[in-house]
Amino acid sequence: MKKELKKQIVEELSKEFTNEVCVFYADFKGQTVKDLEALRKAVREAEGKARIIKNTLARIAFANNGIEAEFEENNIFIWGEDQITLAKIITKHAAANKDTFKIKGAVIEGEVKDAAYVDEVSKLPTKDELLGMVAFMMKAPVAKFAWALNKLIEKKESE
């Protein structure tokens, strides 16, 4: 790869990794093209990006943003703003491809995290699920109050 192309890639990644909240990385050794395409499709649907990047270029891009990270072997980098949804996608992919896809860690809000952290994040509810829970909790007392009023009205009408 030419030096100018490498510089361009590093600049692009530095901007991406600055603007994005989280970057996951995983070993994809042994993955088929079909498996990687399925992962990329799922990531795109979650408005994220997935790309195989040379470790040195990724390390420099992170260093440009003040993050010290070391990468070994083959890595696919997955990044986007919705860290919980992306964590769920890659954890599900890792479970379905245990021998060929291993989550190594993540860089979330400027901190390097391990694979166990990614697994814990994947168990959290997504933003949409949380909003649904809040809406349900807000609706429940109103529904109970309306039910009580209806029973009171029925009782008054029957008297």
Curated annotation (Swiss-Prot):
Instruction: Please provide one cellular component term from the Gene Ontology annotations of this protein.
Output: ribonucleoprotein complex
Name the domain of life this protein comes from.
Bacteria
Tell me the disulfide pairings in this chain. Answer: none
Checking SUPFAM superfamilies in the record gives: Ribosomal protein L10-like (SSF160369)
Which GO-annotated molecular functions does the record name?
A: large ribosomal subunit rRNA binding
**Any keyword Transmembrane?**
no
| A single BP term in Gene Ontology | translation
Q: InterPro entries from the xrefs? A: Ribosomal_uL10 (IPR001790), Ribosomal_uL10-like_sf (IPR043141), Ribosomal_uL10_bac (IPR022973), Ribosomal_uL10_bac_type (IPR047865)
Q: Which UniProt keywords apply?
A: Ribonucleoprotein, Ribosomal protein, RNA-binding, rRNA-binding
Hey, which family's this protein in? Answer: Belongs to the universal ribosomal protein uL10 family.
Its biological purpose is as follows: Forms part of the ribosomal stalk, playing a central role in the interaction of the ribosome with GTP-bound translation factors.
Subunit structure and binding partners? Part of the ribosomal stalk of the 50S ribosomal subunit. The N-terminus interacts with L11 and the large rRNA to form the base of the stalk. The C-terminus forms an elongated spine to which L12 dimers bind in a sequential fashion forming a multimeric L10(L12)X complex.
Q: What is this protein called?
A: Large ribosomal subunit protein uL10
Q: Which organism is it from?
A: Nautilia profundicola (strain ATCC BAA-1463 / DSM 18972 / AmH)
Task: Read off the lineage from the record.
Answer: Bacteria, Pseudomonadati, Campylobacterota, Epsilonproteobacteria, Nautiliales
